Amino acid sequence: MFRGEGMCSPKVTAGTAAAFGGITDTLQALGIPAGCCADGPSGIRMDCGTKAFSLPNGTLLGCTFNTELVGALYEMTGKELRLNKIDSLLGPGMNIHRNPLNGRNFEYISEDPLLTGRICAAQVKGMRRSGIGSTIKHFCGNNQEVGRSTSDSVMSERCLREIYLKGFEIAVKEGGARSVMTTYGSVNGLWTAGSYDLCTTILRKEWGFDGIVMTDWWAKSNYEGHQAEVPVKAPMVAAQNDIYMVVTDARSNPEQDDVEAQLNAGVITIGELQRNARNILGFLLKSPAIFHMAGRISEEELEAMNAREEDDIDANNLVKLTSNPETQEIVIDGSLLHPARGNADVLAVTNDFLGDFNVIFTMKSDLDPLAQLPVSVFLDNIHKMTVSIQGTQGKWIQETRILNMGFGNNHYIKLYYGADNLQIKEIRLVPVTE
């Protein structure tokens, strides 16, 4: 349960950042649901092409000085999250505007800890009114662009508490935040993802926080006095950083982390793992995920689902395809597709092979050769190619293109059709091994 899966895990809403909690068959059999979280903070990001409202960025929200308005805005966002079966938005962003060259300043509220805390507390409370969690981030002290994933933020305790922690304290105590994301990099030499002082002493014991803590995506941790390394995850467990984000498959331990080895060596205990699991379960029991698993959908969600626009993509009901375990090929049967002008099909695919694929389209059209029939292909909502054929007068032809799927095992392929009178027999994705 320590490992979250992503990005774009097929176990939760399509195109989202991560799944956590009940993400194995064993845990699901125990009645533990899979929780879902999605980027923010400026609205919901779903990489499969599902529409969502784009919200004003954090700095603009700070400029309003209007907590009531911000709260109402994020109550609406909470309802949109419910519609898309997402349990937590990865936001608000709370880093202080220390360096004007920080490339992510637009996500954050201001240089003022009080304003930051109050605006973010309003966002948290707004989403809670819709039954949604929010993950306040990044905890804490990561405020520059150069070396953003590795820098060490050195500061006094007074500076830390009065500037860089104060906004988080307000969001927890006044807003009731139930999820926190730690940073990349370190504070005073210890990487925040494995800092017991931050994740337990201050956050939980001093502020009374009772939710979950997760890492930033692919963050590292270190043993005090040592360099941070990818396999070093046991300090996260000990610090009460409950969820490491993310791996492609939680059961197989693809990053070869040291949790089991350090458990056997007595460096961490089964009690610490159980404590962290309890935190995750507590979060899920208060989230929409538990109701979705039980098949209980509120009237508000049903109303919103019925109000979808005709061209909206329903991220919860996509066709899911998995590569053949022997050949690693992925076959998209033409019967699954709807090739007509203006239509789009989105499919969730899971590939074990990482690298280039030959994408072989078998298509025909009854039109004459003067006709042009384009099909645009998007991978994770990014345009990759357009395959255009002429009319074939009823003869099946094949067109082959190269598509790289070298990053991650879960993707969303969108096909957009620019013309009528096109028939697709199949689309076959074949790994390029030579």
Locate the predicted segments by residue.
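Glycoside hydrolase catalytic-domain context in secreted enzymes
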Residues: 1-352, 356-360, 374-398, 402-406, ...
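Solvent-exposed strand-to-loop "edge" motifs in beta-rich extracellular domains
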Residues: 84, 361-367, 418
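Beta-strand acidic-aromatic groove motif in beta-rich domains, primarily in extracellular
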Residues: 366-376
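A short local loop/turn or secondary-structure capping micro-motif enriched for an aromatic residue
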Residues: 368, 392-396, 422-423
